[in-house]
């Protein structure tokens, strides 16, 4: 696919989703059955309306059955499914119905709350609609078909995705809101996080624990002793996920994360990528100065490359109260961020150090344990 975007001065090639791959392979199957000839490429319209010419990597057909495969090309966005083959079998039927299912390597939903019903193949609504429409257009109105999408590498590749968090077991999902993969875009990632949040809400939860990643997850379960069932990753998208909790009417949010990540939120930085905003030292220096810390400490902290290194200096100087000040600012900033939209959300914060453990919390830990047990 020769379509590009520019990001930070660099040129990146776009690609296409697993949903587009499945639609193209399905169309190739139908064309081979109808023409009784091999098809090396097909033209498909993606879910977003873009027309693409997709190469077909594998072809096999008989009178009323065909198999085709398309290799996933994510462009310069090398995700978990890039390069894998998406296979489709199409069998013509005597009725006019077109049905779609997933086979080997396509995950199955095991929990309520996502856009796929329990027991169904993890083929999301937009690509499902697109695959069915593509086949119907090629077949005409009076013929029917059974479509089976499968991916031999799917179960292994799925280990590198968030599917298990969503209760999708046994393989990958067939995805694609637009059908196009845009490199350096966070939208797909954010959508996955939102899906997990929606699943928790649909299961009846009205309070949620947001963590930046594995460190926070481990600390919640192994140090605080809270249930893993309340935990959802927010990655670097703190503001986005806070807004999502409000949209979904969660009443309480507990953010638990490493101090080096959450300290940024105290200064109103709600996307915590270091490439976008790395003001950790500056925030620490400002808050230490307000507490009356000596210039020598401020200068030493400013030179630290990590909050772990700064933490050692802060502890030696006896200014650990700075952590209490900062967690309260994180809480205040977060609640102010949500202030002008309803419903209201109560936010609490726990932050920790890899070397020093628990640093500070907006409430006593025993009180939080009672609230979140």
UniProtKB/Swiss-Prot annotation:
Intrachain disulfide bonds: none
Class of this enzyme: transferase
Keyword ATP-binding applies: no
InterPro entries reported in the protein's UniProt record: CbiD, CbiD_sf
Keywords recorded for this protein, A-Z: Cobalamin biosynthesis, Methyltransferase, S-adenosyl-L-methionine, Transferase
Pfam family, one: CbiD
Single biological process term from Gene Ontology: methylation
Reaction(s) this enzyme catalyzes, per UniProt: Co-precorrin-5B + S-adenosyl-L-methionine = Co-precorrin-6A + S-adenosyl-L-homocysteine
Pathway where this protein functions: Cofactor biosynthesis; adenosylcobalamin biosynthesis; cob(II)yrinate a,c-diamide from sirohydrochlorin (anaerobic route): step 6/10
EC number: 2.1.1.195
Key word Calcium present: no
Superkingdom in the source lineage: Bacteria
PANTHER family recorded: COBALT-PRECORRIN-5B C(1)-METHYLTRANSFERASE
Protein name as it appears in the record: Cobalt-precorrin-5B C(1)-methyltransferase
Organism field: Listeria monocytogenes serotype 4b (strain CLIP80459)
Gene: cbiD
